[in-house]
């Protein structure tokens, strides 16, 4: 089985299982395309993950005003009055990660968070992931790119085809080959999932 097949199976499982769980969130691959709800306001996009927790979030101007005041310093005042279609790529990333922070899950699964991002956006994404970690939220980076993943991780989990999991602590990252594919590193066909707990 190819690494991408295993990765796809993990992603599909996460997307179906975490939908019902407030304590878990998924940041999808290419989130500025897949997680922005066009036609909705910036505030509606930001509050999307709260609808299960706060039943009347859409009509409660008091709660929405409080959220705006709390997040203005992080997001900027101007974005709240912009159409989501007019946001910059950076502002879209900020919106998505702020939505997750507002949800306040215990764990966030990030599917290929750096895929397709240029250097400036990679740095911005890395800082946003650090913000989640600083809030005590566990971040699991589901990727095939070890270089990006290991910069944030405090351990590496190798999942073998038979489901066996091998953990590599941060102090042993220097021995992990960075070249692709890593078949020589694996005993069987595996995929890697990194996370910081």
Predicted feature residues:
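Hydrophobic anchor residue at the start of the ABC signature
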Residues: 97
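Helical segment within the ABC ATPase nucleotide-binding domain
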Residues: 122-135
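Conserved beta-strand-loop-alpha-helix hinge in the C-terminal portion
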Residues: 163-190
